[in-house]
Amino acid sequence: NWSNSNTFVEYNSNTNCSTVVLHRTAIATYDHKNEALKLNSGGYTTNTTKSRLNAILSEIFVGACVFQKNFNWFFNYNNQTHDFNDGMIITEGGVM
């Protein structure tokens, strides 16, 4: 269940996408057809946003995570680390 007081999931049957919303910000959108996940902090690089993104990632791409070092966010998957960028798209093959 991905719903609580400040986080919920919306499914759009027209696009076949599920979107996780935190405080009115779409932080992740999963395209079920293409098996791709779009990440977005909405400019809120907080522990809560990072925690929600990591919870989503752990369900879809095992071993993927967002982490912070020296106040900067990074994304790690398949032993590759990338700068975290709003709008980055993750697939089984890595970052697009």
Q: What is each PLM-predicted segment?
A:
Residues 1-96:
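Terminal leader/tail segments of proteins
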